[in-house]
Regions:
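Conserved protein kinase catalytic/activation segment
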Residues: 199-202
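Conserved N-proximal alpha/beta basic substrate-recognition cap immediately N-terminal to
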Residues: 2-80, 95, 280, 286
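Short Pro/Gly-enriched beta-strand edge/turn motifs at strand-loop
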Residues: 20, 107-113, 171-177
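A short glycine-rich, hydrophobically flanked beta-strand micro-motif that places a catalytic Asp/Glu
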Residues: 184-197, 320
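ATP-grasp fold ATP-binding core
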Residues: 67, 75-77, 84-102, 111-126, ...
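ATP-dependent carboxylate/phosphate-activation module, predominantly the ATP-grasp catalytic core
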Residues: 117-182, 207-229, 235-236
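Generic beta-strand structural signal
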Residues: 82, 108, 130, 194-196, ...
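Peripheral (often C-terminal) accessory segments that flank ATP-dependent C-N-forming ligase machineries
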Residues: 228-320
Length: 320
């Protein structure tokens, strides 16, 4: 499932409105980087992120070939049909857990799909800032998934987590190698699996743009795009940060009463990407994001659940 903005005309109109502003800095964010087919008609030297060309490179077979060339561990993948059920069916363009399915016998792959071996381990994502062939780790998060057998890796939450220095050093080395190979710029997200048995790190995918962790990053690194931003050594956080996605269990069009509730919470630090009045949200699409922090991991998880439950109840939605 690819991002559907329902508003390509509005996006085009907005770009036409701003494209003559030669001093305008911009970032191509989540969803847009996966959907756009060509570079924006803006001053590309002011792009604070990565190009559409690069996004297309890393969302293709070439990405895995590049990683192998750089001796970076990835799960075994193949286009052959004679495999066992301990493989997933993935799309090279997958992000956020979309376009990943469990193996089905006699399945026929399309041109952008492949089989990837299942690695039993902890799913983590690392956010890092790239500039001038150097990097700074911004945060390291644990990924939590929705309970959905057909789509087992749809991300529901990310929560920051503390890791041993040996793991942090390994993550830094992997990010630095990838960043230098692709000459990455700005905020990037790398998804990995820390294998339970061997403690080996396997790279799953690179998303070379801001994503679900944006709120978390800006709450800790407010000067990230300023010249004064320093690339000091990453330290485990004193607070745990978390972001939870509230999905709709049915097709939803916000009525006036529901939108009044949305307006009352729109300036809360606990919410972002809230919907507009009369906006149509399809079943299983995100409604909004919930954010909070705590000094204890368990309390953070409980707070995310409590805030999400209250939101769902006030919108009179089924629990989910």
């Amino acid at each position: 499932m690819q991002a559907d903005f329902h508003e390509y005309k509005k996006i085009s109109n907005f770009i036409n409105l701003i494209k003559n502003n030669e001093d305008l800095e911009f970032i191509i964010g989540s969803g847009f980087s996966e959907s756009l087919e060509k570079e924006l008609p803006l001053n590309l030297s002011l792009n604070k992120g990565n190009s559409i060309y690069l996004h297309k490179q890393i969302k293709s077979k070439k990405f895995f070939l590049d990683l192998k060339k750089n001796k970076i561990c990835i799960p075994h993948w193949t286009l052959k049909k004679d495999i066992s059920s301990n493989y997933l069916v993935k799309d090279f363009k997958s992000f956020g857990g979309n376009m990943i399915n469990n193996y089905i016998k006699k399945i026929k792959l399309n041109k952008t799909q492949y089989f990837q071996k299942i690695i039993k381990g902890e799913h983590i994502s690392i956010q890092f800032y790239s500039k001038d062939l150097d990097i700074k780790i911004l945060s390291i998060c644990k990924q939590l998934f929705r309970k959905d057998h057909c789509n087992p890796f749809i991300i529901e939450s990310i929560v920051s987590k503390k890791f041993k220095r040996t793991i942090i050093n390994k993550l830094h080395k992997i990010c630095l190698r990838i960043s230098r190979f692709y000459n990455l710029n700005g905020i990037n997200n790398l998804d990995l699996i820390l294998e339970f048995k061997t403690k080996k790190l396997f790279v799953i995918e690179l998303n070379a743009r801001p994503g679900l962790s944006t709120n978390m990053i800006y709450s800790k690194h407010k000067t990230i795009f300023k010249k004064s931003f320093e690339k000091e050594k990453f330290k485990n956080p004193s607070f745990f940060f978390g972001t939870h996605i509230i999905y709709s269990d049915k097709k939803l069009t916000l009525n006036k009463k529901q939108y009044e509730y949305i307006k009352n919470i729109q300036f809360s630090n606990n919410f972002s990407e809230l919907p507009r009045e009369n906006e149509i949200i399809e079943k299983d699409e995100p409604i909004c994001l919930v954010h909070c922090k705590s000094k204890k991991f368990k309390i953070l998880r409980d707070k995310l659940k409590k805030i999400s439950y209250k939101f769902i109840r006030n919108l009179e939605l089924p629990d989910g």
